């Protein structure tokens, strides 16, 4: 994400790395120190975020509006007003708006007007009967010891956002492997595709805003590998 775009996104969302509303002065400071914006989440912030509730909405439509220089789509679902930020590839893909799409929502914050802000997570309207079971290999490295496990990870849609994969994999790791408890914060997720390409996610940081709009075909995923490191 470019420096200018990142600063605007930070100001528009009203948060830095802790998920709390900040002043414009703090947003300016974030612009000057770009590298800190996605790297200051401490272990409690990450645990809180990846333990939080998520929502999966279907058939969502809305026009793109400009909000402090960022593209947003506003919609109402389950008596809650939502504000969807398009900050990555989805910004170019949905220049005018979205129509009949699925949206995976995780709360970034509630603004003073009561709108729930979320980022990315837009995919095509999926066939609910589609389900892919993928091997999830988890390697826990503690000092010189290695503990390896193999789980089954279910994806119930054909097209899935990187945001949803990241969130659900980390939530699984939080619940079953103690991620973000004690000193277990570091490591990575590697999503291996059948064509040899891969997506890597650093467990020491929250997924970057601009990557939350990336999408994958679940049928193209070969396996998912996780390395957990304790320091």
From Swiss-Prot:
Keywords of this protein's UniProt record, alphabetized? Secreted, Signal, Virulence
Provide one Gene Ontology cellular component: extracellular region
Instruction: Reply yes or no: does the keyword Ribosomal protein apply.
Output: no
Query: Could you tell me where this protein is found in the cell?
Result: Secreted
Is Transferase tagged as a keyword?
A: no
Entry's family note:
Belongs to the staphylococcal/streptococcal toxin family.
**Subunit note:** Interacts with host IgA and complement C5; these interactions inhibits complement activation.
**What function does the entry list?**
Plays a role in the inhibition of host complement-mediated lysis and serum bactericidal activity by interacting with complement component C5. Affects all three pathways of complement activation and inhibits the cleavage of C5 by preventing its binding to C5 convertases. In turn, prevents C5a-mediated neutrophil migration.
From the Swiss-Prot or TrEMBL record, give the protein name: Staphylococcal superantigen-like 7
Q: Which organism is it from?
A: Staphylococcus aureus (strain NCTC 8325 / PS 47)
């Amino acid at each position: 994400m470019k420096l200018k775009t990142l600063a605007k996104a930070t100001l528009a969302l009203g948060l830095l790395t802790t998920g709390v509303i900040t002043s414009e002065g703090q947003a300016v400071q974030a612009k000057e120190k770009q590298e800190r914006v996605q790297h200051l989440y401490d272990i409690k912030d990450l645990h809180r975020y990846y333990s939080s509730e998520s929502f999966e909405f279907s058939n969502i439509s809305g026009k793109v509006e400009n909000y402090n220089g960022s593209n947003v789509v506003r919609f109402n679902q389950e008596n809650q007003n939502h504000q969807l930020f398009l900050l990555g590839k989805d910004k170019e893909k949905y220049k005018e708006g979205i129509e009949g799409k699925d949206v995976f929502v995780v709360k970034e914050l509630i603004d003073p007007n009561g709108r729930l802000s979320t980022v990315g997570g837009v995919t095509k309207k999926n066939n609910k009967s589609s389900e892919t079971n993928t091997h999830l290999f988890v390697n826990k490295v503690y000092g010189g010891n290695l503990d390896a496990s193999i789980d089954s990870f279910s994806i119930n849609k054909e097209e899935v956002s990187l945001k949803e994969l990241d969130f659900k994999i980390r939530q699984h790791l939080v619940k079953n492997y103690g991620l973000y408890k004690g000193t277990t914060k570091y490591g990575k997720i590697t999503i291996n595709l059948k064509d040899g390409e891969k997506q890597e996610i650093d467990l020491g940081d929250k997924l970057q805003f601009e990557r939350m709009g990336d999408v994958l075909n679940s049928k193209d995923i070969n396996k998912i590998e996780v390395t957990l490191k304790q320091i």
